[in-house]
Amino acid sequence: MTTDTRLEYDSLGAVEVPADCYWGAQTARSLKHFAIGSQRMPLAVIHAMARLKKAAAIANRDLGVLDPEKAKWIIQAADEVIAGQWDDQFPLAIWQTGSGTQTNMNVNEVIANRAIELAGGVKGSKSPIHPNDHVNCSQSSNDTFPTAMHVATVLALQERLLPTLRHLLTVLQEKAAAFAEIIKIGRTHLMDAVPLTLGQEFSGYASQIAAAQAHIEYALQHLYPLAIGATAVGTGLNAPAGFGDRVAAELAQMTGYPFRKAENPFAALAAHDPLVMLSGALKTLAAALMKIANDIRWLGSGPRCGLGELRLPANEPGSSIMPGKVNPTQCEALTMVCVQVMGNDAAVGIAGSQGNFELNVYKPLIIYNVLQSIALLSDAAQSFTDHCLVGVEPNRQQIQAYVERSLMLVTALNPHIGYDKAAAVAKKAYSEGKTLKEAAVELGYLTAEEFDRWVRLELMLGEKGTS
């Protein structure tokens, strides 16, 4: 950026702007007055906003509101923003006006100045393209920003998170099938329990991910309705009839996703319940991933002094002081992401409750946290799947040793000798270091042959194919 400046003007007067920048007066004022934190408006929102400006230019042109030549320059400039050509022209923090007005104007100014340049004009002149009169024609920040929020979120879900979850689910299902015949001891309350198969255990993980994915896909359906056309308070003031429907249709054609104008524009401005719902679904996914990652790292603990039922792939040396140590780092990274997503959901829930009258003014905070949750979950789940889960293998020797030592196999005797006698068998075996069979026979509750007939692992597993 050069030190040369130019003067740009808004309703408050003149503002100095770096000469080589495409933003204008309102962006410059925001940079001056809202130098808060390091969090910038996500580029996903900027690109979604540029898609919206392109769709609006097309709709305004077709409705006779915008000159076709002006529309052409706006569309070309918007395409450049969508392509990421001007990503460095969007410097604003998320800590700004709660309606996202400053970001809306940042996009308007950049597109307008680039369109002016394409038309052969002078950057900053507002001629032949004006950021408000032409780029923002038929729009308000109050309907454009929430529209961009939905578009950005849908794209992030469809193109990042959902494909990652499908990959994760496939690997979990493959592991469940591969481990279907490996009998192990279950654990409840962190204590030994009755047996199940390792495949059954992994089928539970797969079911959790499938359910979380379904919750996200349900929430996704509520993000297709868009606020565009509502303008300032939901009445559509200054927007031509049919504008919102046309813009939504253009966005649907551009993206391939079924966007449509919201049935109730007032709720679309004043509340962000669909994003709150989605954030809750993301938290549910985080809870599932936390449980899965914790189980896998506990089952892989050791190698000699832990549970050691699973062998996890080594990604890197684990300690700067203990040679040969390898840690479950993919599980650790994933669980940290899950904690962050849960925190983000708390912020989104509070922000979503703060819609006063006709407008919620926590929009930048909501979209920042939702998009961060999607990005973190996408990246972490992909990393966990590719660098840990696919390489997980059973330690059959350790698993079998636990099965042979388990006292909870005594549960199979309950129907034959009763709970109290079965408990006495387990107590005697534990206190005297005997096998269950030895203890049961010595107590006179059954014969060795009866024990072998009744305590059979394959009869204690239920439906091994349960998923």
Curated annotation (Swiss-Prot):
Its EC number is 4.2.1.2. GO terms for biological process: fumarate metabolic process; malate metabolic process; tricarboxylic acid cycle. Pathway: Carbohydrate metabolism; tricarboxylic acid cycle; (S)-malate from fumarate: step 1/1. One of its GO terms (cellular component) is cytoplasm. The keyword Lyase applies. It is found in: Cytoplasm. Gene3D superfamilies: Fumarase/aspartase (C-terminal domain), Fumarase/aspartase (Central domain), Fumarase/aspartase (N-terminal domain). The active site is at 189 (proton donor/acceptor), 319. Its main location: cytoplasm. The record marks 332 as: Important for catalytic activity. GO terms for molecular function: fumarate hydratase activity. SUPFAM superfamilies: L-aspartase-like. It catalyses: (S)-malate = fumarate + H2O. Keywords: Cytoplasm, Lyase, Tricarboxylic acid cycle. The keyword Zinc does not apply. It is an enzyme of class 4 (lyase). PROSITE patterns: FUMARATE_LYASES. Substrate binds at residues 99-101, 130-133, 140-142, 188, 320, 325-327. Belongs to the class-II fumarase/aspartase family. Fumarase subfamily. There are 2 substrate-binding sites: the catalytic A site, and the non-catalytic B site that may play a role in the transfer of substrate or product between the active site and the solvent. Alternatively, the B site may bind allosteric effectors. Involved in the TCA cycle. Catalyzes the stereospecific interconversion of fumarate to L-malate. Homotetramer. This is Fumarate hydratase class II. It comes from Thermosynechococcus vestitus (strain NIES-2133 / IAM M-273 / BP-1).
